[in-house]
């Protein structure tokens, strides 16, 4: 889409105006400068024909007194098609001091007196009208208004430029030449000096400004504000970044100048990586760190003297030596002297290691190949250079020395080396010249430079012999240019201006309200009113302030305000947005979205479309095209048409005026012909028909038709009796050479539809909107500042731009979020939520899927809310799930809640109170203000508790040992217990059984906690308590989980139910008793039978003893394993500890079936530990039931006391 450019500026309010009254601001955005180049008043006359001073000579009618005192006055105002002197000089006025007499020229000089500077603080309109008056200063009356010598009118167009444009006025009385230019102040650019751009190189930007005021990023920076650094070329965009140009900072795991190389595993020697921390071995290298050389022969070539190398293993090799060599690397030669290895006359002698050379004099080295350096140490003295020879040396002596070792001094004064000296003195190894004053150097041939910075203020020092002379710059004098000529001595500044003396000049520091070179100008900055769009102008001391309407901003209120750049807007449609406002009761104000630019009005259409109604003078889809009102060529007589908004302006050629340049300026209106000559008007000229013998262009001479001002622009005048004829210089024509032959606009230098306007000997281009530059060659960047919202991409065109929107957005400036819910994609009563480039459906209970198209089970009502089927939530320590209308929760008793002492009920439920925990319940001290929520009546004790002795298939007791240093302070026993209730294995168990966990601190060890786990009666033969104990051991041994409490566990003791022994004695005695009663009569026989049974009993006892010995033999083999911890029971029965290296095999010996015993062994074998030291298995101990247990501390090796019968397995980390 094509849009009109819209700039964004900050808004000002009335309080900003009050602030401006106290703030010093720039007093202009540019200057109009005019400089007088030359003046020629041949006769010293005024415009009315009178002499400047005195009367005429009656004989030759020439002025008799001194010449005119000429100065100039300038009036600059808006462009006038018909120039009038009436009215104010709206753009400014100024004057020069007296510059000279009748004839003078300032060309080639740098005098500021001939220059007038008119500052302006508004957008320069380019077209202007200039009135220049040459006046005669009246020395006698010193009147402020001088007498008019000549007046020049010029209407034209000029663009800001550093180059001067030269203009010439050829009047009937005098001719003068001047030049003009318009320059913008620093940081101001554009045809109107109203584009601000200040270079910066800091956090908010790094750029300079080109000749048109556009930002040009410094090297290494990019982005709209040039604050995005360009990284080093080749820097990986995925693994590197930078904050400074040329940088490349790597992410973790990457390295290299371009961050494209991964960091290998630490210690990786001969390996590479594809991803960080890998070590992929190079060829012929192996090992975890690629440090094992698999091809030592290939990489090191250790075998010498032709030996053959064979790889025998990583970092190992073997050399097979050639005949005549031996050693590990074949480095030892056999019969080495046969090859005559000793060079340079050396004698060879064989040794056990090979050979040995006895070298001739002057040679050394293993084979006598090295020439002995006889120059070490250096034999040459006094800096002589030593040259080594065979068994000798030669010295190259420096100047002043001779001899074999440079030990003899030479007399240098014999050669008369001193030039400007009194005498020469021979020294040892040198000579000395006694120089004359002003000379230096070893030979007194250097003139001493006496210029040591004595000349001040830029003076040039000229060196003399034994002296100097200062050449002072203008403005300074004195022997060392130390005196500044005070140009302020004459007090040139007016209206209270303060004079500041400068080098060869001065500067007036004007008070508020005055300006000009001498502070002679009093300017009202609100005349003409620079504020646009109905804004009120306030004139300040040295500036003006525009109070803009709500919808405009900028220095002159010339730009539509984009409210949505600084505040959030609600998009109503493509034409309207709503912004917050205090001016309406609703708190919002509806404004235009500026889609149609500053020259159109947006009309919203159905379906999110819109149309633009253009202002007069504009057309196009977005009113971006200014209608060319110059298409009909309305300007006549060589006038140039300048297209404006719904109007045009004609810039007339010299000699023409009027709206369409249809009026020939009457050059005879000022009666230029003297002595009753008749004036005839020409185009930009006049002709005088002289009478009574008068001659010259204005009938002012008796002698000749020609004078210096007759022919213009360098033309040569020829007197032909009753008339004159001008021979014009190249490029000019006309009776007086005042018409240019070739226009500076031919051929048209302005490109891209620009209009060329002749201005003296130069031209100016009026560019079409969207183009800039001196010849309209540069396309204006309509994408600056970025006009596209929501990450849209701006495409710049010729006075237009197009926004290519990101997915999910639309509209001419990508401000409209596409509503994907308009098509109602969500079905079955669901709610559609619009998102960026998508939508989301909020499904009702019973439905799921992207569009709620899938049916699910019935919902549940939990805590007064409808919950979808399959949803899960937590209730205290339990997890609940809705399954087709029914709620299923885990059955874990959550224990008492924690609370804070001192608060109202401490956060406990209404039926409970916060009870402080006991000292022994604080596991990791201190526990300040900790409490637990309990009801007023304590619950009945459970038969399965950590402090009770009851155990069965639904109750288990476990003791955990902790490392408190790894646990946080303020941890109570109940905190630990609550953490255990959240273990996943107990969670899984609580889905099938009701589970209760209680904890009590150990009375014998401060780092132990006794824990009881109870479930409801098992529904099968297999007890869940056995499974859960095995899983707890496996969980703790592998340190699974992220819990701090699990990681702090260092030991586990699991207490199990003893297996009852099978007793055959009771049924045997019962049978015997019955038999005795039946066979009472046979007492003798029964006595015999009784005797025989006693013998059988002895036999069984011997057999049992044999079996016990066999068992003891097995245990004796196990006891051969060294055990670092040994414990003894109270009755002296030893308990053996067995230590496994990587696993634990806990064999619980019972009298149950072998299958069940093997199954239990397999479960216990899961408790494997990957770190040393390993756990220690303590064999179980059986004790009598129904007795309170006395716990044994595994850390102090104390004896076990008598306790209830139980099976105990102890694991020590």
Curated annotation (Swiss-Prot):
Keyword flag Calcium: yes
Gene Ontology annotations for the cellular component aspect, listed alphabetically: membrane; plasma membrane
Subcellular location: Membrane; Cell membrane
Membrane protein topology class: Single-pass type I membrane protein
GO terms, biological process: auditory receptor cell development; cartilage development involved in endochondral bone morphogenesis; cranial skeletal system development; dorsal/ventral pattern formation; epidermal cell differentiation; exocrine pancreas development; face morphogenesis; fin regeneration
Cystine pairings recorded for this chain: 184-193, 197-209, 217-226, 231-242, 235-248, 250-259, 262-273, 268-279, 281-290, 297-309, 303-319, 321-330, 337-348, 342-357, 359-368, 375-386, 380-395, 397-406, 413-424, 418-433, 435-444, 451-461, 455-470, 472-481, 488-499, 493-508, 510-519, 526-537, 531-546, 548-557, 596-612, 614-623, 630-641, 635-650, 652-661, 668-679, 673-688, 690-699, 706-717, 711-726, 728-737, 745-756, 750-765, 767-776, 783-794, 788-803, 805-814, 821-832, 826-841, 843-852
Region (Disordered): 1181-1202
Main location: membrane
Entry's transmembrane regions: 1065-1087
Ranges of the Cytoplasmic topological domain: 1088-1213
Domain EGF-like: 227-260, 261-291, 293-331, 333-369, 371-407, 409-445, 447-482, 484-520, 522-558, 592-624, 626-662, 664-700, 702-738, 746-777, 779-815, 817-853, 918-956
UniProt keyword Cell membrane present: yes
Keywords attached to this entry: Calcium, Cell membrane, Developmental protein, Disulfide bond, EGF-like domain, Glycoprotein, Membrane, Notch signaling pathway, Repeat, Signal, Transmembrane, Transmembrane helix
Signal peptide: 1-26
Extracellular side: 27-1064
InterPro entries: DSL, EGF-like_Ca-bd_dom, EGF-like_CS, EGF-like_dom, EGF-type_Asp/Asn_hydroxyl_site, EGF_Ca-bd_CS, Growth_fac_rcpt_cys_sf, JAG1_1/2_dom
VWFC domain: residues covered: 860-914
DSL domain boundaries: 182-226
Single GO term (MF): Notch binding
CDD domains assigned: EGF_CA
General function of this protein: Ligand for Notch receptors and involved in the mediation of Notch signaling. Seems to be involved in cell-fate decisions.
Record-linked PANTHER family: CYTOCHROME C OXIDASE POLYPEPTIDE VIC-2, DELTA-LIKE PROTEIN
Protein name: Protein jagged-1b
Organism: Danio rerio (Zebrafish)
